Amino acid sequence: MTEREVGRKIGVKELSPIDVYKLLPRTNCKECGEENCMAFATKVVNREVPIEKCKPLLTKEYEKAYKQLKEMLKPAIKEVVVGTGDKAVKIGGKLVMYRHEFTYFNPTAIAIDLTDEMPDEALAERINKAAQFHYEYIGMDLHLDMFAVRSTSGDPEKFKATIEKVMDKTSFPLVLCSFDPKVMEAGLTVAGNTRPLIYAANKDNWREMAELALKYKCPLAVFAPNDIKLLKSLVKTLLEYGVEDLVLDPGTFPTDGLADTLNNFTMIRRAACKYGDELLGFPLIGVPMTVWLEGEGLPEEVLKWRETYLAGMLIVRFADLLILHTADWWALLPNVILRQNIYTDPRKPVAVEPGLRTFGNPDENSPVMFTTNFALTYYTVASDIESGKIDCYLLVVDTEGIAVDSAVAGRKLTAEKVAEALKESGIEQKVKHRKLIIPGKAARLSGEIEELTGWQVLVGPRDSSGIPKFIQEKWSPT
């Protein structure tokens, strides 16, 4: 018996454009911007457009079909929004357990912790340090996402005052951390309208925390350390109570319980994605900073290292939100790069727009080079050109986001494509010479390019780090 026959919701791998098309108005009205309803259905299945772009579907006539489609397209992991406005962070929203099955959405959010017992100067310094963390990686700005304000004092007024200070200094979304409902309510009186994540409800305080979540319309974390059965029970109770936006914390144990931590995260995500367990179909929160609670007596650098590798483990073990204590660049950078790589869409390579780029102040005698539009290749070449302070033109050829050697082998980079790109770029009107420097890994195309373009081809270095030396030794416009 198939999964459809037993009544399970259609999975993303089983869902076809026909399934969606059958429930659309099928009028080909083009209000969605597509030529016909089938084209729109295809984009909906690929999650390229929301179903709400079909305006007729939102009318009373198609209300039943709209509800069916929303249920059909509902992700296995509910998407929860923390914060408001431009800085709002979406967590969850996963359709599959493993990225290669489709793709991942909403990269793991990273929050840095603050406490209500920090001196004002230290608080401001820590906020600025985290907020200023930025790193450009293949054209993307990698940064942190949130702050987690912890009540270590247990004093409602202190907690409230600290949150006010934090909100004065940053617009990042907040996680408010306390198991005491009175402390939490004090914080929510200040931050409630910014939709913070309430951390957390447990078996002792769930009712009070649920009331606060409903009152302030905020998402709520559910905490049941190393007890999935209790976690499900709490989720069921909270859903029945009316709280819909939940985030699950099954506990993070950095030492003896590390295996349990990874197993729990995996079992929860598997239950939701593979077996349709809706009680576990919520974002997961990991707290690598627990290493600081269990590491008394150990050197600070050792604890930072432990927290860093634990964060990396949880990123690849389905965590949708992490709370960290370490804010050092060396500890954060590996994980934001790991996160970016994990959340890259495997269905399409990371690419840049093809076309002509200028570096420095090139003139009619400046070198002309070309590379592919694979993002990693382009930004590596661009970085080496800039560091070498070279005034030149760089032609970016469309290879569908594939690197030079692979593009040549797969016929995505051909002499014909280079000739076409040269013609379309208008470079012939910008320089007097007719010399083109090509990547060393595209050397086999040199003869064909010369025949098709009439340009003299210079075979450049195999690695872009050699460009400055190559220009210095080999380049002459005459």
Where do the protein language model's features map onto the residues?
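Local cysteine-cluster metal-coordination motifs and their immediate loop/turn environment
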Residues: 25-43, 52-56
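Non-heme iron-sulfur electron-transfer modules
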Residues: 3-16, 42-72
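Short beta-alpha connecting loops at secondary-structure transitions
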Residues: 6-7, 23-25, 218-219
